[in-house]
Amino acid sequence: MIARLFKFKGGVKPASHKDESAAAPIRVAPLPSHLIIPLRQSARAMARCLVQPGQTVLKGEMIAAAEGPLCTAVHAPTSGTVRAIAPQPVPHPSGLPAPSVILDPDGQDRWIERQPFDYRSVPAQETRTYLRDCGVVGLGGAGFPSHVKLGPGEKGIETLILNGAECEPWITCDDRLMRERADGILAGASIMRHIAGARRILVGIEDNKPQAIESMRAAVQRLGEADIEVVAVPTRYPAGGEKQLIRVLTGIEIPYGKLGTHFGVQCFNVGSAHAIYRAVAHGEPLVSRVLTLSGNMTHPGNFEVLIGTPIRELLPLAAPRADTDRYLMGGPMMGVALLSLDTPVIKGTNCILAGSPTLFPPPPPEMPCIRCGECAKVCPAELQPFELYWFSRARIFGKAQDYSLFDCIECGCCSYVCPSRIPLVDYFRFAKGEIWAREKEKAAADIARERYELRLAREEREKEEKAAKLAAKTEAGRQKAAAALAEAAKPAATPEEDAKKALIAAALERARAQKEQVHPENVSDLTPEQQAEVAAIEGRRAEIREMAKPHLRQDD
């Protein structure tokens, strides 16, 4: 049992608006007319496409393979035919399109052959690879690959935390999932504990979800495993932030640049645990998720939706009211505006929120900062947002980093309380984007400079090698010339030596003459003309031999 709960700094308590969508059970959304499946479903990398236009696929068939350690596979959410592979709008603040597979369902929803995965009989690394190939990522919004988070870390995992806080207003998909599928969530947690080697499991749920807490505690009793505890945590936004929930449950503060694994703690969304259970126990890759449709809706609720479903085809399920003028993907605190209703549902989509001038009135004009310090009081990362605002606005990014810009979790608490209605988080996102872009440019410039320096070094080395070869050749010529001069400088031979040399030369000449002696040709059978021709040839040979004889120097 946990002896006590801890508090995190800051935070706010906005109106929750949970009851609007939490009352009804999860409903299954019908098959859409088409699916748009972005090839980048994890937060870090894009998968490699495996299909071609015109190809038929089954539900759960891999259509894009993971490449790199931070990538996960992508699968067909239903059976059908690949229409095209083309850039399509995706839920991102930039609004830029991304490569996607467009799939036309055949209406049969035929699965691939599914087999349970025996995770207990294989090494943990093999199970992590299996989860990567099943496309399992964090379903709380960040989309970080689950197989990476299940790694052993530097010190091993002591405590596994399931995040069921769901602290942002309006969103209730995790609440309904815990009420209806608690057994699957805890079965997934048990699988994760086996993979990571964790000793205990803590399930953190905000105390404004009593039915979810009761359902999860009953599931713990049915599972019958030791060291699993469901903990009700105080309702305060952003208690569902990973570092904040770790702080509340364990008292551990995770500094910037460090992960929970550095302290023996790892945190997973309850939806991720359920996805791992479906992948391992049923052989089902992640092709659907539960999301909330709420806000300015006539029939808000939670729906199980295929990944890739266009938002436009989901909205009739909840019947937006006539005065709806905009939509958010995510909650009102951290969500991003949808620039197109053709944007598809991705694995990290937890809510579609409809807005209206009455429900979400447009913000008043931005006023100058009065340095009241309210933003610093509510910042859960204990930053000074007003200072970060000045540096970000003035593009003094170095100072912004000195003031721990990247510790900001973009929860929106500072913007929520700002009396000047300054969109502080927008400034911080802008500054982070500029810094990342500059670092990327600097990295590219460093690579180019390194290549240039290597080329200069290679050219200098080749130049030195050529100079060394030329010097060696010059030295060899000099030595040869010196040897010739030394030979020419030797004194003349004596008469006795000359006579001896003459005798040797004469002996050599006799030996050569004997060797070259040509035996008379057999000319008895030749005609007189032929014999005369042979004789002429022999005469010429004799003349040549006589001319080739060396002239011996005679002594005086």
Model regions and ranges:
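N-terminal, Lys/Arg-enriched amphipathic/low-complexity engagement segments
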Residues: 1-50, 102
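Short, well-structured beta-strand-loop connectors
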Residues: 52-65, 84
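Conserved hydrophobic positions within beta-strands
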Residues: 80-82
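Acidic low-complexity segments
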Residues: 84, 89-139, 144, 210
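Gly-rich Lys/Arg/Thr-decorated short loops/hinges at beta-loop-alpha junctions or inter-strand turns
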Residues: 109-111, 138, 160-174, 297
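Hydrophobic alpha-helical positions that pack around
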Residues: 165, 199-311, 317-322
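Ferredoxin-type iron-sulfur electron-transfer modules in oxidoreductases and energy-metabolism complexes
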Residues: 349-366, 376, 380-490
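Charge-dense, low-complexity intrinsically disordered regions
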Residues: 489-556
